[in-house]
Structure formats: C-alpha cells, structure tokens
Amino acid sequence: MNVCIYGVGRYGISTYYKLGRRGINIICFGDRNVQKQGYIVKDIRCIPFEKVLELDKNKTVIVVAIKQNNAQLVDMFREKGFRYVCSYNDIKDRADEKILLIKRCQI
C-alpha cells in the first residue's frame, strides 16, 4: 500500500517521520499551495492537488495532514473515490492502531 500525505507543512512533516519510522511506503506529498509544489522531503516530492487525484484510488492511502478543514478534506477525498483516507489527528491520537490499519489497507 502506498501513502500520500496531503499537506507538506508542519503536520505533514510530522506525519512523514511518524509513518516512515514504522516502515510505511510514502510515495508523495500533495498540496494545493503552488509555492509548496515541487518541495522535496527526503527524496519525497510534493505534487499538485490535481496529480493527487490521479493516484490509484484503490491502492493509495491519503493521510490529510493539515491543521484546518481536515475533516472536510477527508470527506472530499472519499467523495473523489479514494477508499483509504484518514487525518493527521487519527495518526496522532492512535498512531499504532492506524498504522496497522494502513499496512492492512483497512482504513
């Protein structure tokens, strides 16, 4: 299972390290902010929102890692057809449980 972290700010970077330490395959960051697109963290590139929507909806976990409107973005990604979506708060509050679910593709 591949993971896209949506948001490359403080929460996104924190999520990257939290998941990366547990062996989760992070393929990209995503962000609507044009200034952040192309930003690279440890060889992981930030792609535009439109490119996030082109990812395989059945094989990509989207972790929404932003401070504001994260519940709305989780809902929006689900409406766009992504099967596996969670928020930074899910990872932060129940990290081990959620990471296990990510590995099993059961989010």
Residue positions per predicted region:
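Short amphipathic alpha-helical surface micro-motifs
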Residues: 10-12, 28-29, 43-47
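Phosphate-bearing ligand-interacting subdomains
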Residues: 34-107
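NAD(P)-binding Rossmann-fold cofactor-contacting core
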Residues: 22-40
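A general structural motif
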Residues: 1-2, 26, 57-59
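Glycine-rich adenosine-cofactor-binding loop
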Residues: 1-19
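Short hydrophobic segments within beta-strands
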Residues: 5-6, 30, 63-65
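Structural/interface elements that position substrates and couple domains in central-metabolism enzymes
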Residues: 6, 13, 24-25, 72-79
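Generic secondary-structure boundary signal with a strong preference for alpha-helix termini
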Residues: 19-21, 55
